[in-house]
Each structure stands twice: as structure tokens, then as C-alpha cells.
Amino acid sequence: MALHSLIADARRLVVKVGSSLVTNDGRGLDQAAIARWAAQIAALRAAGKEVVLVSSGAIAEGMQRLGWAKRPKEIHELQAAAAVGQMGLAQVYESEFARHSIRTAQVLLTHGDLADRERYLNARSTLLTLLSLGVVPIINENDTVVTDEIKFGDNDTLGALVTNLIEGDALIILTDQRGLYTADPRKDPGARFVDEAQAGTPDLEQMAGGAGSSIGKGGMLTKILAAKRAAKSGAHTIIASGREADVLARLASGEAIGTQLRAPTGRMAARKQWMIDHLQLRGRVVLDAGAVEKLTAGGKSLLPIGVTEVQGEFARGEVISCVDAAGLEVARGLTNYSSAEARLIARKASSEIEAVLGYVSAAELVHRDNLVLL
């Protein structure tokens, strides 16, 4: 089945709209543009699709309301602008969706909300309940309390995380660009447009400029990485221009617009997906070659004897990263021991744990049922 048909058949969509598509060149909200987005999403709802909207624009609206001509550099001022602007963003979306008799809900999330298992499940339950009630959730990062997301702004990642959270069928990232090219078309006249590819392939990241490039910072690279993340849960991604007329309706009808990135695998188990979606891990363990082989090829649990080093501070039950000697992450899992305990039993046989600690919580540092390979 063609990817376009898969998108057309998708029941649950996450739509991410960038700041340039909802603001007047960064100076306050463009209510006419938001009205068009509301109309398009209303049409999707009428066609039987569930839609979650991830929208930027709060800081731009806050600056307008506060009378600031230039974007401030101080984090606390950006946070203040976000707090003021979030009111306007919610008001405009509410009024425009009301024209179509659709209720909206404002949901502000942080990475911490999705890293904590209980809060993650609560957020998931709330969003699924809203969708079942016919409500369109409007999601944004809680910029008022988060600093890194303002500094490096990345609602593309948030869109992917939300897609995984609600087990969405597809992520649609709308931007002011047509999609992905083999090179920067502004600099390379030979750049070719990529209409379809498999998400997560290394070539895509190179096309987008690679990590740390001038092209990639806050640009296409974040979208490529978001597609890679969404693909882990079996969701396909479309990167398309929000300037295209009726782009959502046309995509939903199966029309080929933008770059279509196919998920290579089926949906992952929910708990393992949650572990992969951790953006900030508090600890990691370095494994010897034998442990790496047993995890990746043998499907075994991680035993303390295979750990050569414990880095960071973490508690029992937290998600930790498992890396090889070169620092390459090979797996993630829920640890049965704290970092302090892990340091004591590292390089020890499981039979020695009780002699070292005085007790045994488990024979494994990470059981294979609580382990996900990357």
C-alpha cells in the first residue's frame, strides 16, 4: 500500500504547526491563518479523524501584547512572554473552532511530564478522553517553566512525543518549506526534492545538514529526527508546506504533498516506547563487549558482571542508558538497582550481590522484559 493511502486511512493524527504559519512574521498571532487551520481540522473531524494540534506562537503573541518589538534574550523575559501569549493563543483557537461547534482544550507539557511514568500515563489518559469527547487538544510546551525548550525551541520533537503518547497513526509537520531536499536549495541549484523515504535512515540526517550544522539548527534536521522518533511507534510522518491551500484536506484525501517518511516497523509495546521517548536520562552504564553481544544478539538481561562503569545518579526503577565502550547507546531499560548500588556490584557475578550489598533485589541490573534495544 502506498504511503499516501496509509495517511488517507489514518484515524488519529497529530498536526504540528510552526510559528511562521500562525503569526504575522513573528509579530503577534495571525487570526485569519488560525481560522483557516481550524476550518481544515474541522473538516478532518467531520471525516471521522481524531486530531491533536501542536501549535507554536505563544512567545510571539506575548511579545505583541507586551509591546516588545524585539525578541528578548533573557530566559525569564521569554518565559513571561510565553505566559502572556499562551492566553491569547488559547483564546483565538477557542473562538475559531467554536465557529465549527468544536470544543478545544489547552494542554501544556514538559519533557518531565513524559519522563515520569505516572504523569505520562495520566497525560495519555487525559488526551484520549478528550479525543473520545470530540475535543481538539491544543498542545504546546510549558515554556513558562522550561528553559531548554525556549532556548532551542523544538515543537517538532514534542509533536513526535505526543504522537507516540496517544499511539497516533501519522504525524504531519507543517512548515514554510516544501519538504526535504538532498541539499540546501538556497545554496545548491542541484538540490533534488525528496518526495518519499524511510524514516530513520542516516542519509536523511545528512541531507538535513547533520547535527550542529547551520541548516539543521531549529530547521529541517529537527523534523527528520522527529520523524525518526515517531517511526519507533509505527507512525508515518509528512513534512509539508503549510502555505499549500487546503493542505490537510488534500493530504487526508491521499494527495502526495511534501516529503512522506514511512515508518519501517510496526508499533512498539507501549512501555518500551515510553523508555525510548526519554529525552533526558539521569544515568547510564558502560558495557563490555560481551554484555553488548548478549543484549543485542542474544536477547539476554543485563547482568552486573557486564557493566564496566556507572555514570550519573539514578534511583531504582528509573530508565537508564546502556552504552558500549565507545559511548554508543545500544539499549535502555528500567534498573533494578540505584547508581550507588550499581557501582558496588559492577563487574561482579550475580551470585556475589548479596555478599556485597547484604541483600538481593534481583539477579539482573536490567531484566530483558524491561529492556529496549535501540
From Swiss-Prot:
CDD domains assigned: AAK_G5K_ProB (cd04242), PUA_G5K (cd21157)
GO biological process: L-proline biosynthetic process
EC number: 2.7.2.11
Any single Pfam family the record assigns to this protein: AA_kinase
Signal peptide location: none
GO terms of molecular function: ATP binding; glutamate 5-kinase activity; RNA binding
Catalytic activity: L-glutamate + ATP = L-glutamyl 5-phosphate + ADP
Keywords: Amino-acid biosynthesis, ATP-binding, Cytoplasm, Kinase, Nucleotide-binding, Proline biosynthesis, Transferase
Coiled-coil segments: none
Amino acids binding substrate: S56, D143, N155
Subcellular location as annotated: Cytoplasm
GO cellular component, one term: cytosol
SMART domains attached to this UniProt entry: PUA
Alphabetized PROSITE patterns for the sequence: GLUTAMATE_5_KINASE, PUA
Pathway: Amino-acid biosynthesis; L-proline biosynthesis; L-glutamate 5-semialdehyde from L-glutamate: step 1/2
Recorded superkingdom: Bacteria
Residues of the PUA domain: 282-360
Top EC group: transferase
Binding site for ATP: K16, T175, D176
Family recorded in the similarity comment: Belongs to the glutamate 5-kinase family.
PANTHER family, A to Z: GLUTAMATE 5-KINASE (PTHR43654), ISOPENTENYL PHOSPHATE KINASE (PTHR43654:SF1)
Protein's job: Catalyzes the transfer of a phosphate group to glutamate to form L-glutamate 5-phosphate.
Name of the molecule in the record: Glutamate 5-kinase
Species annotation: Ralstonia pickettii (strain 12J)
